[in-house]
Amino acid sequence: MTTAETLRPALRRVLAQDAGTSADAHAIAAAALRAYERLAEVLTPLFGEAVINAVCARSVHLAQREFSWLAPAGSAEPHDAPITHVRVSLERQDPAVATDAAVAVLATFGELLALFIGDSLTTGLLRDAWPDAFSDDTTRETTT
């Protein structure tokens, strides 16, 4: 399996574990921000904050194709991660739509990362950020 095939279900688990299964859009937006922050915490020492923010901005831009209401990636202050403005956009949506959009942004981030460093390394880093989201079987299939 590739990162793309396993990432979206894993991200739904991340958001559900953090926000709860019957969460409102505010809780989902907060969970998405925390998920991004955990990922950035793992990736920033390896790639630097500027690279992480650039990949995030690109992820938001690509997700806007499906969710045109997402905050423009360029609307963030230079020192803010683009995801901070996405949170406001997510809070204004129906919970199901907010979940789909949050998953799209975070999954696109993971997919872009996989293009740069490969599926195996990406899966390992994603597992470091969200250890409960990936089952052992999924990780074994992805890394072998």
Annotate the PLM regions.
Residues M1-T144:
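Long, compositionally biased intrinsically disordered regulatory segments in eukaryotic proteins
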